[in-house]
């Protein structure tokens, strides 16, 4: 006999591709940026929302400042707002630009390709 989960379905996740533009030198490291994002999210939406959203950085290029953050689907607009509110990370002034929201990491990573790159439809 197969056991059923009583709690319901596993929450779906969305992946938001973003780019960090640093005004003071190189972009911050992954840990510095994740700490700044969590702090802004906590201040804007509270501890309960932060716990339910479970934001985490699944991909981050420290040289370019590009990355992907995973979040529970119901909180995707919260993470977009929090990304826009991040102004300091690792002691540097930064501006975070959300590029694309996707249902898969692979789809989010496509946002980093150049517009004429293969697989993007030449758009």
Curated annotation (Swiss-Prot):
Keyword Manganese on entry: no
Catalysed reactions, as listed in the record: Endonucleolytic cleavage of RNA, removing 5'-extranucleotides from tRNA precursor
Superkingdom, natural source: Archaea
InterPro entries reported for this sequence: Pop5/Rpp14/Rnp2-like, Rnp2-like_sf, Rnp2_archaea
Coiled-coil regions, chain positions: none
Similarity field: Belongs to the eukaryotic/archaeal RNase P protein component 2 family.
Protein name per UniProt: Ribonuclease P protein component 2
Organism phylogeny: Archaea, Thermoproteota, Thermoprotei, Desulfurococcales, Desulfurococcaceae
């Amino acid at each position: 006999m197969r056991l059923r989960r009583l709690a319901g379905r596993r929450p779906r996740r969305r992946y938001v591709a973003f780019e960090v533009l640093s005004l003071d030198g190189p972009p911050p490291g992954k840990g510095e940026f994740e700490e700044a994002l969590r702090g802004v999210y906590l201040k804007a939406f509270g501890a309960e929302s932060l716990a339910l959203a479970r934001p985490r950085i699944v991909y981050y290029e420290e040289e370019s400042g590009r990355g992907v953050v995973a979040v529970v689907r119901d909180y995707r607009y919260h993470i977009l707002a929090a990304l826009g509110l991040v102004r300091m990370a690792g002691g540097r002034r930064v501006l975070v630009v959300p590029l694309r929201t996707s249902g898969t990491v692979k789809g989010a990573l496509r946002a980093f390709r150049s517009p004429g790159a293969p697989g993007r439809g030449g758009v």
